[in-house]
Design a protein with these regions (language model features):
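Second-shell loop/turn segments in exported
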Residues: 36-43, 71-78, 87-91, 102, ...
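A cross-kingdom marker for long, charged
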Residues: 203-276
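Extended amphipathic alpha-helical interaction segments
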Residues: 123-222
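Bacterial N-terminal signal peptides that target proteins for export
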Residues: 1-7
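N-terminal mature-domain "stem" immediately C-terminal to a signal peptide or N-terminal signal-anchor/transmembrane
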Residues: 22-61
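C-terminal segment of classical bacterial N-terminal signal peptides
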Residues: 13-20
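Acidic/histidine-rich, surface-exposed loop or edge segments in extracytoplasmic proteins
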Residues: 64-73, 82, 86, 212-214
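Acidic/His-rich structured neighborhood in mature extracellular/periplasmic domains
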Residues: 73, 77-167
Length: 276
């Protein structure tokens, strides 16, 4: 009798440990992919962008704000560790069932590592004043010379639906900022009014996104050969690449929506607590 009980317990334990082991293996695979993508450096740059954006918000909406207090608030909102955690959780969930190994193999290769480094360097360079204008000048020069890289950039944009995904992400972030303002008591706009205001921004957001994205991609990928860019494009045309693209957008959009809401709440709190 005791033998049967032991056997039953062993079977139950076995059925419990298999999913746990699979989850641990999956987590390790995703950890390796995040490392190959250098996610922490990406988030660190976004953290710096957030600090700058917070300062701009203060200048535009709260010129008389206590900047020491506001800067401390912005630093708490754009906490890099929390930002990374948000992205990791969402991307990991979205990649459930997708092939991870081919992605890690590519991004851990010499070419993949170089592409990641070029993308990060380009994004960090855009933190410098005047860099966006420099990128647009470079884009104009490339267009006049009809450089082959431009056609490949168009292919990357089209294959991964980069403009539409970025536009929708930006609009959703703006929506969450409005909701933060309302929930914080700084605005009495209803949901219909908020949605109307956000949709009015669509054309401007789309134009800005198109301009920024093409300049950024040119700066990032111009050092690569046509063959290198084609190999990268082929990765994102594959099933694992499409899954990663969708998961990354979902992860970063989730992060930005939460940050935007918190930023709206923070603005509301500072505005409503300001002395008359």
């Amino acid at each position: 009798m005791m033998g049967r009980i032991f056997l039953a317990l062993a079977l139950v334990w076995g059925t419990w440990t298999l999913p746990a082991q699979a989850a641990e293996e999956r987590a390790a695979q995703m950890g390796a992919l995040f490392e190959a993508l250098d996610l922490e450096q990406t988030v660190e740059i976004m953290h710096e962008e957030g600090l700058r954006y917070g300062a701009q918000i203060a200048s535009d909406m709260m010129p008389d704000a206590d900047m020491d207090s506001w800067n401390a608030t912005i630093a708490r909102i754009y906490d890099a560790e929390r930002m990374s955690g948000l992205v990791r959780r969402e991307v990991t969930a979205r990649m459930d069932g997708a092939q991870i190994a081919p992605l890690t193999t590519f991004f851990a290769s010499d070419l993949g590592g170089r592409i990641v480094a070029l993308e990060l360097a380009a994004r960090r360079s855009f933190l410098q004043d005047g860099m966006e204008e420099t990128a647009q000048d470079a884009l104009g020069a490339a267009q006049r010379q009809n450089l082959p890289v431009l056609e490949q950039i168009e292919g990357l944009i089209s294959d991964s639906d980069l403009i539409e995904r970025n536009v929708m992400g930006a609009l959703n972030s703006n929506l969450m900022f409005y909701r933060g303002l309302v929930d914080g008591g700084a605005s009495d706009l209803g949901e219909a009014d908020i949605l109307a205001d956000v949709w009015e921004q669509e054309n401007a957001v789309r134009e800005d996104t198109d301009t920024w994205l093409r300049g950024f991609l040119l700066i990032a990928y111009q050092p690569l050969s046509e063959g290198d860019i084609e190999a990268y494009a082929a990765l994102y045309r594959s099933a694992p690449g499409r899954a990663l693209n969708a998961a990354l957008f979902a992860g970063f959009n989730q992060m930005y929506e939460e940050l935007s809401y918190l930023l709206g709440r923070a603005v509301a709190e500072h505005v409503t607590s300001a002395p008359l």
